[in-house]
Amino acid sequence: MRKLIIGITGTFGSGKTTVAKMLKKRNILVIDADRLAMRAAKNKRVKKKILQEFGTAGRKKLAKTVFSDAKRLGRLNKIIHPPLKREIKKIMKETRKEIVIIDAPLLVEARFLDVIDCLVLVVCNNRTRTGRLVKKGFSEREIAARTGFQMSDSKKIKYADFVIDNSGARKETERQVEKLWKNITSRK
C-alpha cells in the first residue's frame, strides 16, 4: 500500500509543529525533523565532523556560530542533512501508517521535495510570530538571524499545495487544519 507523504514547512516560529500536532491526533505518523537533526548531531561520526568544522558541538554555541554566517550554516546543513534524510526515509519505509507527515523548517531549502507528495506551508504574520518566539525566550536578534537564513514565505508558496495561516486564533487554525485533512483524506 502506497503511503501519502505530507511535508509541513514554514518560517521559524510560524506554527509548523502546532499544525503537525493537530494532525497527529488523527492517528498518523509525524516525523519531527528538528528532533531527528538533534539526534543525528549526537551520532559519533556526525559529532566528530561538527567538532572538526566548528570547534564545538554544543547546541547553543553551535546555533550562535551558524546563525551568524550563511556559509557556516550551509556547512552544518551539509553535515546534518544526509544522515537526516536517510533516517526520515528509513522511518517512512518501516511505518505501517498510511499517511506520514514530515515537520521540517527547511523542506524546500534542503531539497526534500522529492520525498513528499504534497507540501503544506504554515504562515504567520511577523508581529505574531515574533511575539510567540519572544515568549519562548528568543531575542528579537536571534529571531531575525534564524529567519534571515530561511527562504521567505513568498518564495516557498510557489512550492506549496496548501497554505495554513496561523496568525489568528487557535480555533481558526484548527478550522484550516480540518479543511486540509478532508482534502488529504480525499486523495487516499
Q: What are the language-model segments listed below?
A:
Residues 8:
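Hydrophobic anchor at the beta1->P-loop junction of P-loop NTPases
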Residues 11, 23:
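P-loop (Walker A) phosphate-binding loop of NTP-binding proteins
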Residues 14:
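ATP-binding Walker
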Residues 96, 114, 138-185:
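Small-molecule kinase domains that catalyze NTP-dependent phosphoryl transfer to phosphate-bearing small molecules
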